[in-house]
């Protein structure tokens, strides 16, 4: 929710509609986001926006997870959700196809291929990124969530995104990326 926008509102509404949840929980990064970037909006204002728009409880994702690659980010969030004894996890996806994403999640990562890439001097996150370069950012995170919930009771609730993560178009369901860029200019 960096910043909170209509797409987030849509996700909350759809997740509540699809799950009939009594309580909506959001796991939210603190002052720093993935890749170690500072949040555009402070965590207090983001949490307030979430609560004003349908979230009942906001749980802070510890920095050690919030600033990591997608698989660690997802695992940290799922670990917190397991502690909260939730039934569902909702996340966005560009492709909107849970079967395809589940198939990808069930396919073992070729560690030898990652090691070969890393042997050229590339970091693990970059090597992993190269292997998943055909996927959109939210689909990558969706696959990581699916892997993280594999041996839990948590069921996935996929919400198809109508815009891409890096879509710069300002529209009713604009991406957070587009909103941040518009505010900076």
Predicted regions and their residues:
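Non-catalytic positions within long, well-ordered alpha-helices that form the structural scaffold/packing
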Residues: 16-17, 51, 78-82
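A glycine-rich helix N-cap at a beta->alpha junction
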Residues: 47-62
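Active-site cores that bind ATP or allylic diphosphates and position pyrophosphate for catalysis
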Residues: 61-185
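N-terminal catalytic cores of NTP/NDP-binding nucleotidyl/phosphoryl-transfer enzymes
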Residues: 1-46
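Hydrophobic/aromatic-rich, well-ordered segments within soluble, folded domains that form packed cores
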Residues: 44-47, 51, 178-182
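Short, high-confidence coil segments that cap the C-terminus of an alpha-helix
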Residues: 18-22, 55, 86
């Amino acid at each position: 929710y960096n910043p909170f926008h209509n797409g987030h509102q849509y996700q909350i509404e759809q997740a509540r509609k699809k799950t009939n949840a009594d309580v909506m929980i959001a796991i939210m990064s603190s002052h720093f986001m993935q890749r170690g970037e500072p949040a555009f909006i402070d965590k207090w204002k983001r949490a307030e926006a979430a609560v004003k728009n349908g979230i009942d409880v906001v749980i802070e994702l510890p920095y050690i997870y919030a600033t990591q690659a997608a698989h660690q980010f997802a695992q940290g969030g799922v670990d917190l959700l397991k502690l909260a004894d939730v039934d569902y996890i909702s996340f966005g996806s560009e492709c909107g196809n849970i079967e395809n994403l589940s198939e990808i999640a069930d396919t073992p990562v070729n560690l030898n291929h990652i090691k070969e890439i890393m042997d050229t001097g590339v970091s693990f996150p970059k090597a992993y990124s190269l292997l998943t370069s055909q996927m959109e950012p939210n689909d990558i995170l969706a696959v990581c969530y699916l892997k993280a919930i594999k041996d839990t009771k948590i069921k996935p609730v996929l919400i198809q995104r109508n815009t891409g993560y890096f879509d710069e178009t300002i529209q009713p369901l604009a991406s957070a990326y587009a909103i941040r860029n518009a505010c900076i200019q």
